[in-house]
Amino acid sequence: GDRGSTISGGIKLATTTGLPEESFWTYSGRYETRRPSNWSEVETNAAQHKIGQAYQMQTYDGVRTFLGSGQGGISIGISWGGEVDRAIVNSFSGAGGGGHAIALLSLSERLDVSGRPYIWMLNSWGAQWGNAGWSEWSPNAVEQMLRHRYTASFGLSDMTNVKPREYTLDALKKDLRI
């Protein structure tokens, strides 16, 4: 039977085979274990969309910087429980639930009390889930998720030569005259 997948397996597929456009392999809203009948077209299209680099994401500032730079999106696997099954997530403990992979794709206009943006997360469960398939995660929740022992989080980019710089947003702000 099916045993699911891993973030590392998805990254390997994205770097070697590529990821097809959704129009070539549509998601029906239900789990399908068989390849579509147009498999050779899927492979040809996927080869045009390979990931060039994967960077481990370990901090909220790293997530914020990566998404804010427009380099790509973040593939994250977490322990999925009821606390994250909502349109706005403010905290995370990792209790109760199995593993689930989702994508962090953009900074939100919603800010926490420190002025840090929430992160937009896209789920695979369709538009009937959350806020039309999306959820906003607070900086606090993201930090808690990244510290959880079962979390795997990688920034994925089609840019092959980009290297992330190590710095904190607070340190950068000190050097700027804002």
Label every PLM stretch briefly.
Residues G1-L122, A127-I178:
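Predominantly the structural core of cysteine protease catalytic domains
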